[in-house]
Amino acid sequence: TETGTPTLRELEFLVMEVYAEPYATQIALDDARLDIEQWLAGEVMVTFAEQEGAAFITGSGVKRPRGLLTYPTVANASYAWGSIGFVVTGGAAAFASSNPGDAFVDLFYALKAGYRAGASWLTSDAVMASIRKFKDGQGNYLWAPPTAPEAPSTILGKPVQTDDNMPALGANNFPVAFGDFRRA
């Protein structure tokens, strides 16, 4: 059978400005052992990363990006364009007490196959501390350490990123995200 007529939708992505104002004392500037250019670049990089992380996760969309967690949420089975689908964890305000890793398997396969290839996990450090203890039915941890110096740790073979702008475990919170954020 033929597919229906495709429709296109124009999306607007506004460019916003971020800035940093690193402070260096005269003593630091005069210190020949300190690579001031490298130090300043590092300070600016950290500040930009913190601002961008907050904007992309919780931003209001007013003079900044609209954050991932500000979109309407719907149960994944009822997914609609412009919404974020979710999978329940099995616990009221936390992960299920038995087999908590099952929610990760459910979330992994809830994401359409075309998006799984470039997908990664996103959570806070506090939630990651809980996740690292989850095991499968054979006693293997779901979390795996990096396999090389620059490689990320993984869950179910997909990279894990942490950002403390993600919410804590709790009722009606979405403490873990999984998707191809480059295509989101």
Question: Where do the PLM segments sit?
Answer:
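Structured, hydrophobic secondary-structure cores that serve as assembly/anchoring elements
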Residues: T1-A184
